[in-house]
Amino acid sequence: GIPCGESCIFIPCITTVVGCSCSNKVCYDN
């Protein structure tokens, strides 16, 4: 639920390595 400051419209979230995931074209951490 916390935005990770990264979008995932064109490329996947790089922040997945720190627990973030793509949701509604924005990377979130829980």
UniProtKB/Swiss-Prot annotation:
Tissues with expression: Detected in seeds (at protein level).
PROSITE patterns reported for this sequence: CYCLOTIDE
InterPro entries per the UniProt record, alphabetical: Cyclotide, Cyclotide_sf
Keyword tags: Disulfide bond, Knottin, Plant defense
Keyword Transferase: no
Cyclopeptide (Gly-Asn), cross-linked positions: G1-N30
Disulfide bonds: C4-C20, C8-C22, C13-C27
Family classification: Belongs to the cyclotide family.
Name of the molecule in the record: Cyclotide hyen-K
